[in-house]
C-alpha cells in the first residue's frame, strides 16, 4: 500500500521516481530519488548514514516528490492548509517564512541589500512546519548545491542547481 501511495505521488509530481522510502528513526522517513549518487551529493548534514529501523507508518502523509528541470534536481512537499513555516537560515524579515523565496548559498553578502537580504551568512536547507493544531514536522533537504527554498502556504519547494539529493521528514507529536 505504501509503495502504491508513493508511486501515485511521484507520477503526479514529475519525471523522477522515488527509489527508496525508509523509516530511519522514530517517525523519521528518508526519501531517496532515482539517480541519487552519494559521490555527487555527499551529505554535509548527517553524522552517519541512516539505517532502516522498520516500516513507514501507513498513515504517513508528508511525502517528498522529486522532479528534474534541465538536469537540476528539485523536491517538493505538500503541507496542510494553515501550516506556519520557519527556517532557511539567516535572512532578513519575519521568522514566519510562508510566501518567501530564499536563496541558499553561503557567501559573504557584505550588505543586507544584496538579494534583498535573502541570504546572509548561514543557509539551512531545513524547514519547520507548525500545523494549526500545534503539532509540528521538519523537512531536511540533504543537498549542499546552490539552491532556492520556496515556502508557499500549501507547499515547500527546494530547487537546486545540482544532482539528485535525499530528503528527510520528521513528523512527531
Model-identified regions with their sequence ranges:
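Bacterial N-terminal signal peptides
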Residues: 1-8
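Catalytic and substrate-binding clefts that recognize carbohydrates or anionic sugar/phosphate headgroups
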Residues: 14-173
Amino acid at each position: 500500500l505504501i509503495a502504491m501511495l508513493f508511486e501515485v505521488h511521484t507520477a503526479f509530481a514529475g519525471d523522477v521516481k522515488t527509489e527508496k522510502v525508509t523509516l530511519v528513526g522514530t517517525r523519521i522517513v528518508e526519501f531517496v530519488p532515482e539517480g541519487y549518487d552519494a559521490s555527487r551529493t555527499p551529505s554535509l548534514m548527517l553524522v552517519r548514514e541512516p539505517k532502516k529501523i522498520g516500516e513507514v507508518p501507513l498513515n504517513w502523509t508528508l511525502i517528498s516528490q522529486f522532479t528534474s528541470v534541465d538536469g537540476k534536481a528539485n523536491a517538493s512537499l505538500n503541507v496542510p492548509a494553515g501550516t506556519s513555516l520557519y527556517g532557511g537560515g539567516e535572512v532578513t524579515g519575519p521568522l514566519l517564512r510562508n510566501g518567501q523565496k530564499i536563496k541558499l548559498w553561503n557567501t559573504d553578502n557584505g550588505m543586507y541589500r544584496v538579494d534583498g537580504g535573502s541570504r546572509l551568512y548561514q543557509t539551512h536547507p531545513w524547514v519547520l512546519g507548525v500545523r494549526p493544531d500545534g503539532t509540528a514536522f521538519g523537512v531536511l533537504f540533504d543537498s549542499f548545491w546552490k539552491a532556492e527554498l520556496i515556502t508557499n502556504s500549501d507547499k515547500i519547494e527546494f530547487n537546486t542547481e545540482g544532482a539528485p539529493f535525499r530528503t528527510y521528514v520528521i513528523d512527531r507529536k
